[in-house]
């Protein structure tokens, strides 16, 4: 099978993996070794002729060395998290001018174990930073891989201030430009060009993947989009609203971190067993409608104990678990799903502004560096929605062009996401179904959505959340354990995933696995084995 022909250099520490690497390569790819590949790389700079581009460097990177982060500014982490190359590749760094007031920085990593496949990575937050870990992950599988800084360096919105060109890069242009340039470099470097084009991204990267599906359907054959920051304008308004609910730490409405722990424990008490198993994980938060009043302090209790809430605090918590509405009661954004309270505190409930919302309103909506999130109202949300620069909301429900060209989307979202409510993904799925007048079985031909229980924002948390979405979540090379390989199998072999199998990792050790259902089905424990037995669950 084509999927099993993908090379696995990052597993080369085992003899079995090393043997597999030596004995396999994509029949559509090219396997370069030693000095010939190095010579091809070192002579490639003179052959690059990309419009509006300034090539900084073309460097041969051998296997087994720390990859230089000289082009990664300190605002993006610099070299604090070095990556060791487990494969040889040709590294190209360049700037591409997108307007008289904007440019992107990008890199292309062209591996010696090329599989005949192209892949673009995405970004995160308001960034701003090349996702080098994702580039290493994809290039390790033999993809010619590109990544950009999304039009500016840094994970904040300062660069947007009075510069709509940088906003345009962030909305869509940086990724699309990187794809166009990256494909040109790939075709020029490898005589056979590329056969299929893929995308892998989460959060802002998830939104970027969906923007490509909606606006540039020919860019990719397969898109893996996690925890998308789509409905972007209303997402920022949702993030701004939390401070108006909680107040600062001195407000009577403020709920302390200790009290949020009590809230979380009560939610788990009420909702954990709704899926049939008491495992500390809420499989489907849709079923969880917590009665927070159960935590009201009685006559002998004090809210200062951290174990109970005042009436004002209960109102705050209920507000968090309520949808956000705008002028005239118009729906803006769904509630925060219950189960994510512990991680969400630092981002949303701590009595301080959510930085991304603050930056978007300051530097884009109002162009006022002194704007105060505490003053946010639904009128502000209406102003932001009326702008929606370059349709950054990324909410088009008509995916017909992508469907007709044969594209595939694998969409996933963690059910404990503390940054982007997982309910937003469910709302979008239904929006696509309604817009295209397609049932779930009809959507299945090109669009499949997998809610991942026990996953926080893009990765990790309490449950079996490692699904091969990146280096730190690698849990196997079977397509059912790896969303990137599942996408390759779907595109190239026509075998679509009916489930995504996640792993609960302890370091690199798999503690247990669970099959995550394809929406709109949900997982239910039916026994008779332990909840750690994947065969004790079924999709209903």
Curated annotation (Swiss-Prot):
Keywords: Calcium, Carbohydrate metabolism, Disulfide bond, Glycoprotein, Hydrolase, Metal-binding, Polysaccharide degradation, Secreted, Serine esterase, Signal, Xylan degradation. Residues 1-18 form the signal peptide. GO terms for molecular function: feruloyl esterase activity; metal ion binding. The active site is at residues 203, 417, 457. Disulfide bonds join 41-90, 76-129, 202-458, 271-288, 297-308, 517-539. Its main location: secreted. GO terms for cellular component: extracellular region. Its EC number is 3.1.1.73. It comes from the Eukaryota. Changing residue 458 to A: High decrease in catalytic activity. Homodimer. Belongs to the tannase family. Involved in degradation of plant cell walls. Hydrolyzes the feruloyl-arabinose ester bond in arabinoxylans as well as the feruloyl-galactose and feruloyl-arabinose ester bonds in pectin. The calcium ion seen in the crystal structure is located far from the active site and appears to have a role in stabilization of the lid domain. This is Probable feruloyl esterase B-1. It comes from Aspergillus oryzae (strain ATCC 42149 / RIB 40) (Yellow koji mold). The gene is faeB-1.
């Amino acid at each position: 099978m084509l999927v099993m022909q993908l090379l696995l250099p990052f597993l080369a520490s085992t003899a079995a993996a090393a043997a597999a690497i030596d004995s396999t390569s994509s029949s559509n790819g090219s396997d370069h070794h030693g000095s010939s590949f190095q010579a091809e790389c070192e002579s490639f700079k003179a052959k690059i002729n990309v419009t509006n581009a300034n090539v900084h460097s073309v460097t041969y990177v051998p296997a087994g060395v720390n990859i230089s982060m000289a082009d990664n500014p300190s605002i993006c982490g610099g070299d604090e998290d070095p990556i060791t190359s487990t494969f040889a590749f040709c590294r190209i760094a360049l700037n591409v001018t997108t307007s008289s007031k904007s440019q992107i920085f990008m890199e292309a990593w062209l591996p010696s174990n090329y599989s005949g496949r192209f892949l673009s990575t995405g970004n995160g937050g308001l960034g701003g930073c090349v996702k080098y870990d994702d580039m290493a992950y994809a290039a390790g599988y033999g993809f010619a891989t590109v990544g950009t800084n999304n039009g500016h360096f840094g994970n904040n919105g300062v660069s947007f201030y009075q510069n709509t060109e940088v906003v345009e890069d962030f909305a869509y242009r940086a990724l699309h430009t990187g794809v166009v340039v990256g494909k040109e470099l790939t075709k020029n470097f490898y005589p056979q060009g590329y056969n299929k084009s893929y995308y892998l991204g989460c959060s802002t990267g998830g939104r970027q993947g969906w923007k490509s599906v909606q606006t540039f359907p020919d860019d990719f054959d397969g898109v893996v989009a996690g925890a998308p920051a789509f409905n972007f304008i209303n997402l920022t308004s949702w993030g701004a609203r939390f401070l108006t609910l909680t107040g600062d730490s001195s407000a009577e409405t403020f709920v302390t971190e200790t009290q949020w722990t009590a809230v979380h424990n009560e939610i788990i008490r009420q909702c954990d067993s709704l899926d049939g198993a008491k495992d500390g994980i809420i499989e489907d938060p849709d079923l969880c409608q917590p009665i927070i009043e159960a935590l009201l302090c009685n006559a002998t209790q004090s809210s200062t104990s951290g174990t109970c809430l005042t009436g004002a605090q209960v109102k705050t918590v209920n507000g968090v678990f309520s949808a956000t509405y705008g002028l005239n009661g118009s729906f803006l954004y769904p509630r925060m799903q219950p189960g994510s309270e512990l991680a969400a505190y630092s981002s949303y409930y701590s009595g301080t502004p959510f930085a991304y919302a603050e930056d978007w309103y300051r530097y884009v909506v109002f162009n006022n560096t002194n704007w105060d999130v505490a003053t946010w109202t639904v009128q502000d949300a209406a102003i932001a929605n009326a702008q929606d620069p370059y349709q950054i909301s990324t909410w088009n429900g008509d995916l017909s062009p992508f469907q007709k060209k044969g594209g595939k989307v694998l969409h996933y979202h963690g059910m404990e996401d503390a940054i982007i409510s997982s309910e937003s993904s469910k709302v979008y799925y239904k929006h696509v179904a309604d817009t295209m007048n397609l049932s779930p079985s009809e959507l299945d031909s090109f669009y499949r959505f997998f809610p991942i229980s026990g996953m926080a924002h893009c990765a990790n948390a309490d449950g079996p959340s490692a699904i091969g979405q990146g280096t730190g979540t690698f849990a196997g090379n079977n397509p059912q354990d790896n969303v990137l390989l599942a996408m390759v199998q779907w595109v190239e072999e026509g075998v679509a995933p009916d489930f995504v199998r996640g792993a609960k990792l302890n370091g690199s050790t798999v503690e247990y696995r669970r099959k995550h259902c394809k929406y709109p089905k949900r997982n239910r424990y039916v026994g008779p084995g332990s909840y750690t037995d994947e065969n004790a669950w079924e999709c209903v």
